[in-house]
């Protein structure tokens, strides 16, 4: 076995011991629903502020936002929607030059997708 894999395992265990979050060890302290909710909230904000960015894709995306988003009831379907559309969401935030959306999308993708 390569020392690279062993070193990564040691790093992951040390991260866990120090209280750091590492999705490869556990999702225990990562609120993926909150992350996904923030991504969708920011996407809706960007689309509202930039009506010229709306197109049939975003209309369809908005129609697929589950009820759990609006009721803030943690369910996996919201995370699935975000993770299945990472590329498009990143592009939306990039085109809008929305740093907050970019940061939240990056965090959600890294921690949860």
Swiss-Prot record:
Pfam families referenced in this protein's UniProt entry, alphabetically: CowN
InterPro entries given in the database record: CowN (IPR024899)
rRNA-binding in keyword set: no
Keywords: Nitrogen fixation
Biological processes annotated in GO: nitrogen fixation
Homology family: Belongs to the CowN family.
HAMAP family found in the cross-reference section: CowN
Function per UniProt: Is required to sustain N(2)-dependent growth in the presence of low levels of carbon monoxide (CO). Probably acts by protecting the N(2) fixation ability of the nitrogenase complex, which is inactivated in the presence of CO.
Descriptive protein name: N(2)-fixation sustaining protein CowN
Organism this protein belongs to: Wolinella succinogenes (strain ATCC 29543 / DSM 1740 / CCUG 13145 / JCM 31913 / LMG 7466 / NCTC 11488 / FDC 602W)
Name of the gene: cowN
């Amino acid at each position: 076995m390569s020392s690279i894999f062993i070193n990564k395992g040691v790093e992951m265990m040390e991260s866990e011991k120090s209280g750091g979050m590492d999705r490869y060890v556990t999702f225990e302290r990562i609120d993926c629903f909150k992350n996904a909710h923030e991504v969708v909230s920011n996407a809706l904000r960007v689309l509202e502020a930039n009506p010229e960015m709306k197109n049939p894709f975003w209309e369809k995306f908005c129609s697929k936002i589950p009820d759990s988003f609006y009721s803030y009831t943690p369910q996996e379907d919201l995370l699935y929607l975000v993770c299945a559309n990472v590329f498009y969401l990143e592009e939306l935030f990039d085109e809008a030059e929305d740093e907050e959306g970019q940061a939240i999308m990056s965090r959600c993708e890294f921690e949860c997708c």
